[in-house]
């Protein structure tokens, strides 16, 4: 039992710095070497060795000592020695010009595993064999963890990877979109797998509300709206946009013919899909793409079809969508011209789950006085968009709550933005916005006091 405690203690101490890096990214991550270089001109330790990591590991060691029944001084000193070993490894790697953050078996694990036994061996009266076995097991476990963190979470999955490489983002991508993780989906996405698909759905069935709720969900329609925009170029007066989002189409396939019935009657200038193809936020996405292709065939748009990704979507969907003729805007913009005048569509990545929306990057190549239509899956970056000078903000995600209560409104909006912009028109400064209730449903296939919609929006100068 003692050997298991020691092994867990060492693993947890060394797991603390990358765990904090996972959740905090670059916050409080001041380099231990202050960016200084050794006399060979190479970094002393490198940017990945931080005061945050050192202090947190030593603090964790002290707390773990109390938890495991070790003397406090043992926890403190063993953790400090382990971090000292880690710094020795980093210093050695820098001298041989080994890049920071890359895996180097044995060198990465040995010193941080062995140095703590300066105090652990005499205090616990461990034999040479016991200490050697513990060091070996520590190195093996630490190496496996390092491979997962550095070679999977911190390795770009493809040459065209468009997002800033962060461990938290990669973990979300892998756990939501990789088939290799399919057996772990219910554990990682517990809220959706159990709460929505089991508990909430069961509630609606027991109360007898499920049938009527599903009927409401299938009762979608088209809403025709006008918006007056003083800065709209004259050539684009009466521009018509078809905007639809939140299909979640593999969860309610009966919607496909109704969507097609509506869309085949429309001849918009621009068609925009606002994200969320898949019903679940994890698992297979081939079905929703196949169903989506049947919908896209019905769309006739003068200036093309554009899309942004939602929190239920995967980067792997982009090539398939582009093969359908859709231009996916991922922190990017596109210029639309007519008779010498132009407008810009500015689309950002998902701001809700993946938290990868970058308004500054998306609008970086646009003239400051240009007319800009901002496309985002959710209303959550409304303040950044207004500060960037957007004229019109189009989004979805909230489903207008999907389930509303009389005189109260949405039970949940699943958005960090104010409830006042959860559906319909809204305004911030000179920017006008519209939040769609979406077409499909999420979680449970019901709606109450809300209706799925396809928006036909006409822009008036």
Where do the protein language model's features map onto the residues?
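Interhelical loop and helix-boundary elements at the membrane-water interface
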Residues: 1-65, 69-73, 83-118, 128-132, ...
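Acidic, His/Gly-rich catalytic cores of divalent-metal-dependent hydrolytic chemistry
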Residues: 142-191, 201-222, 430-431, 435-461
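N-terminal active-site segment of His-dependent metallophosphoesterases
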Residues: 196-286
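Beta-strand-turn-beta hairpins that frame and shape the catalytic cleft
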Residues: 220, 229-242, 334-347, 367, ...
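Active-site neighborhood of phospho(di)ester-bond hydrolases with catalytic His/Asp-centered motifs
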Residues: 242-245, 270-276, 303-311, 329-331, ...
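Core catalytic region of metal-dependent phosphoesterases/phosphodiesterases
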Residues: 253-338
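Binuclear metal-dependent hydrolase catalytic cores centered on His/Asp/Glu-rich metal-binding motifs
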Residues: 323-324, 339-376, 382-383, 444-448
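Conserved beta-sheet core of the metallophosphoesterase superfamily
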Residues: 379-455
């Amino acid at each position: 039992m003692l050997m298991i405690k020691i092994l867990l203690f060492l693993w947890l101490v060394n797991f603390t710095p990358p765990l904090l890096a996972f959740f905090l990214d670059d916050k409080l991550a001041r380099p231990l070497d202050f960016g200084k270089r050794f006399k060979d001109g190479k970094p002393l330790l490198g940017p990945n060795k931080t005061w945050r990591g050192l202090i947190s590991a030593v603090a964790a060691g002290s707390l773990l000592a109390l938890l495991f029944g070790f003397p406090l001084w043992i926890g403190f000193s063993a953790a400090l020695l382990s971090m000292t070993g880690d710094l020795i490894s980093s210093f050695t790697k820098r001298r041989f010009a080994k890049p920071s953050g890359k895996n180097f078996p044995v060198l990465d694990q040995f010193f941080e595993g062995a140095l703590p036994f300066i105090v652990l061996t005499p205090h616990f009266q461990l034999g040479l064999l016991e200490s050697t076995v513990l060091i070996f097991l520590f190195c093996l476990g630490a190496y496996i963890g390092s491979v997962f963190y550095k070679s999977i979470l911190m390795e770009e999955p493809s040459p065209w990877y468009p997002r800033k490489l962060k461990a938290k983002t990669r973990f979300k991508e892998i756990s939501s979109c990789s088939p290799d993780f399919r057996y772990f989906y219910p554990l990682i996405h517990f809220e959706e797998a159990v709460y929505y698909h089991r508990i909430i759905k069961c509630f609606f069935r027991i109360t007898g509300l499920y049938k009527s709720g599903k009927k409401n969900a299938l009762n979608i329609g088209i809403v025709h709206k006008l918006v007056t925009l003083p800065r709209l170029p004259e050539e684009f007066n009466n521009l018509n946009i078809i905007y639809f989002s939140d299909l979640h189409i593999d969860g309610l396939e009966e919607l496909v013919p109704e969507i097609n019935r509506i869309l085949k009657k429309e001849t918009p200038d621009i068609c925009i899909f606002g994200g969320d193809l898949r019903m679940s936020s994890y698992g297979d996405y081939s079905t929703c793409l196949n169903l989506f292709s049947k919908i896209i065939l019905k769309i006739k748009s003068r200036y093309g079809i554009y899309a942004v990704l939602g929190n239920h979507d995967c980067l792997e969907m982009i090539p398939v969508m582009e093969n359908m003729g859709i231009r996916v805007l991922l922190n990017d913009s596109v210029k639309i011209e007519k008779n010498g005048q132009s407008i810009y569509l500015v689309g950002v990545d998902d701001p809700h789950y993946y938290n990868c929306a970058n308004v500054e990057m998306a609008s970086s190549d646009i003239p400051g006085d240009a007319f800009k239509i901002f496309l985002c899956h959710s209303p959550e970056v409304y303040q950044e968009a207004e500060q960037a000078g957007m004229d019109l903000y189009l989004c979805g995600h909230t489903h207008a709550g999907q389930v509303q209560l009389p005189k109260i409104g949405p039970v949940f909006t699943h958005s960090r933005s104010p409830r006042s912009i959860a559906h319909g028109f809204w305004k911030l400064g000179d920017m006008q916005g519209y939040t769609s209730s979406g077409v499909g449903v999420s979680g449970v296939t019901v709606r109450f006091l809300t209706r799925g919609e396809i928006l036909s929006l006409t822009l008036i100068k």
